[in-house]
């Protein structure tokens, strides 16, 4: 339009009124034929110009209220979505402070993480580096399947039976945020609350609140001065967790934890013999008079990596506000006591580590719990040697008879189904005479099998356990582990027939002398592969088979009965393990698994 005006202006400007009037008349005459199109053209240019001006110059003031509101609303909506859609823990708020918490994208095919950010994570790739269990070959000796630490796949990335699947995960959701910075100085009332709730599953927590160290100050002036110290301590602990993960994650992610050897390390054991008064007498070999001590200085060394030394302070920080539960037989009690001693030795004030109430029975099944007060966490053990219920019926003669209900899980299962980390095991009690024979002992419903092979009974029991896990344990909130069979080393008999191991002071060094891989563990592996809920298999069978030197043998107690004094060598324990000892290494593997999973989650967050 400007060019048209210039085009029809008089040369040299003109000067008379008549000329000007004529020019104006001429100008409008020229526009008249194109009046409609010219007006539309001018309107479009004007609208676009104003639109661009407001779009690229947003302002909160009244000069651009419409676009200002659009930008502000968009930002607010994004923040809200992220907050409601991501429930990450304080640990990861600290570890990844600059990562925006959003719903994760699908992981790469080689990820092996049961700590996926939500329940719709992709299924585990069968060829993943550290998460696949290959079918054990029919070998004479214990096979070491590549990457035997595996998680069973989740069909289509989801578990249809899991309840309340959310993006919250164990070790991820901020359970400690409800107590804020006061976790380090819990009141007596808080402690009593912990004690009262040890045998009840924790109520579903609300959406976690991220802990912001910059604003985590008390409004009370009397406590404000102590806040910087608490914050500094928390930052130091979380920084240590981050450093531990960064230090070990790369070497551990492709490592086959269970293929390796025992090597001597003079820096072991992880706690001084006799320093932990929590150890049962039957595991306290040095106190019971065992003279040799080299068995305590051995650590498990995988071929392709080194396991991190278990740092109790860091593990406690990972477990802050959480429950770690062991469920199974006395071998899992062995592992539980080992971990409690390691963690207890890492706290500054051991008076703040205590047993919740001693041995507690729930419907006939024993439960033990230790409270770590400064961390508001518990490490518990539930006695369930078969993982299914021991039963009692009355026969036609009115005589009470013991049976094993293959179709019912242990009675205490309701008490631990909501725990954050659960470590199951079973195996040794299936070798006893009654279970081995299987005559009039195994029961399903009202039917008592006159005869049932022990392997079939074992399969039925584990299938019942697996179905219970899929129905009751939410993989979005709980990590599930299953520890494999722990080898026994009776020579010249069994546990009740004069079997011995008291002369063993060194581990087996030649694989030829290892025992065949237990058939029951092959059954277990098949059940785990068929499960939808991720279960990490701690296949410690082979690594324990080397350790014929690690059992209590005759050093299982100090005061012998008169009968035992006459033939002390006839009463030996070659099933359980001295503490400190082999179970410490099981816990180091568990610790390494947690580091791997936390690192995988952090990588997933970074990608989003």
UniProtKB/Swiss-Prot annotation:
One of its GO terms (molecular function) is O-acetyltransferase activity. Its main location: membrane. One of its GO terms (cellular component) is membrane. A motif (GDS motif) lies at residues 328-330. Belongs to the PC-esterase family. TBL subfamily. Residues 101-236 are annotated as: Disordered. The chain crosses the membrane at residues 38-58. Signal peptide: none annotated. Residues 215-227 have a biased composition (Low complexity). Expressed in leaf vasculature, growing part of the root, expanding inflorescence stems and trichomes. Keywords: Membrane, Signal-anchor, Transmembrane, Transmembrane helix. A motif (DCXHWCLPGXXDXWN motif) lies at residues 573-587. Residues 101-137, 145-203 have a biased composition (Polar residues). The gene is TBR. It is found in: Membrane. PANTHER family: PROTEIN TRICHOME BIREFRINGENCE, PROTEIN TRICHOME BIREFRINGENCE-LIKE 9-RELATED. It is a single-pass type II membrane protein. Contains 2 motifs that are conserved in esterases, but it is unlikely that this protein belongs to the catalytically active pectin esterases. Tbr mutants are lacking leaf and stem trichome birefringence characteristic of plant cells that contain highly ordered cellulose in their secondary walls. Pfam families: PC-Esterase, PMR5N. Required during cellulose deposition. May act as a bridging protein that binds pectin and other cell wall polysaccharides. Probably involved in maintaining esterification of pectins. May be involved in the specific O-acetylation of cell wall polymers. InterPro entries: TBL, TBL_C, TBL_N. This is Protein trichome birefringence. GO terms for biological process: cellulose biosynthetic process; pectin biosynthetic process; plant-type cell wall modification.
């Amino acid at each position: 339009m400007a060019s048209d005006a210039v085009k029809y202006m008089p040369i040299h400007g003109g000067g008379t009124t008549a000329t000007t009037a004529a020019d104006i008349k001429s100008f409008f005459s020229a526009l008249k034929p194109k009046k409609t199109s010219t007006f539309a053209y001018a309107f479009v240019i004007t609208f676009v110009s104003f639109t661009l001006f407001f779009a690229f110059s947003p302002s909160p003031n009244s000069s651009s209220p419409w676009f200002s509101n659009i930008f502000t609303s968009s930002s607010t909506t994004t923040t809200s979505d992220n907050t409601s859609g991501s429930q990450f823990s304080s640990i990861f708020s600290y570890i990844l402070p600059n990562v925006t918490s959003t719903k994760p994208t699908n992981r790469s095919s080689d990820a092996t993480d049961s700590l996926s950010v939500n329940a719709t994570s992709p299924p585990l790739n069968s060829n993943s580096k550290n998460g696949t269990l290959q079918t054990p070959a029919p070998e004479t000796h214990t096979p070491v399947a590549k990457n035997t630490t595996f998680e069973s796949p989740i069909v289509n990335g989801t578990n249809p039976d899991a309840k309340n699947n959310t993006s919250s995960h164990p070790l991820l959701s901020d359970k400690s945020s409800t107590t804020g910075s006061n976790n380090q100085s819990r009141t007596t009332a808080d402690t009593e609350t912990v004690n009262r709730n040890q045998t009840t599953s924790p109520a579903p927590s609300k959406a976690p609140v991220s802990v912001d160290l910059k604003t985590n100050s008390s409004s009370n002036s009397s406590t404000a001065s102590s806040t910087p110290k608490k914050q500094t301590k928390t930052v130091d602990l979380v920084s240590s967790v981050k450093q531990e993960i960064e230090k070990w994650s790369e070497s551990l992610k492709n490592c086959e934890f269970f293929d390796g050897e025992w090597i001597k390390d003079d820096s072991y054991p992880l706690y001084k013999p006799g320093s932990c008064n929590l150890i049962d007498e039957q595991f306290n070999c040095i106190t019971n008079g065992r003279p040799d001590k080299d068995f305590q200085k051995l650590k498990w060394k995988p071929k392709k990596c080194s396991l991190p030394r278990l740092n109790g302070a860091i593990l406690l920080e990972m477990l802050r506000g959480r429950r770690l539960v062991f469920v199974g037989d006395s071998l899992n009690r062995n592992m539980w006591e080992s971990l409690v001693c390691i963690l207890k030795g890492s706290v500054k004030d051991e008076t703040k580590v205590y047993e919740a109430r001693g041995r507690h029975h729930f419907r006939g099944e024993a439960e033990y719990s230790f409270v770590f007060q400064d961390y508001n966490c518990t490490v518990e053990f539930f006695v369930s040697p078969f993982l299914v219920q021991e039963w009692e019926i009355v026969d036609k003669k009115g005589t009470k008879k013991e049976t094993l209900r293959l179709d019912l899980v242990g009675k205490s299962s309701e008490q631990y189904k909501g725990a954050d980390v659960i470590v199951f095991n079973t195996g040794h009690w299936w070798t006893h005479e009654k279970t081995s024979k299987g005559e009039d002992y195994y029961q399903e419903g009202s039917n008592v099998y006159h005869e049932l092979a022990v392997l079939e009974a074992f399969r039925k029991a584990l299938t019942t356990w697996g179905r219970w896990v899929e129905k009751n344990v939410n993989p979005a909130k709980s990590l599930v582990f299953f520890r494999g069979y722990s080898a026994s080393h009776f020579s010249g008999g069994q546990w009740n027939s004069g079997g011995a191991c008291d002369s063993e002071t060194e581990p087996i060094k030649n694989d030829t002398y290892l025992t065949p891989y237990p058939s029951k563990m092959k059954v277990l592996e098949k059940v785990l592969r068929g499960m939808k809920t991720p279960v990490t298999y701690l296949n410690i069978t082979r690594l324990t088979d080397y350790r014929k030197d690690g059992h209590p043998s005759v050093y299982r107690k100090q005061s012998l009965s008169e009968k035992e004094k006459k033939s002390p060598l006839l009463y030996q324990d070659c099933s359980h393990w001295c503490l400190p000892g082999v179970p410490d290494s099981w816990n180091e593997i568990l610790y390494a698994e947690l580091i791997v999973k936390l690192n995988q989650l952090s990588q997933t967050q970074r990608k989003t």
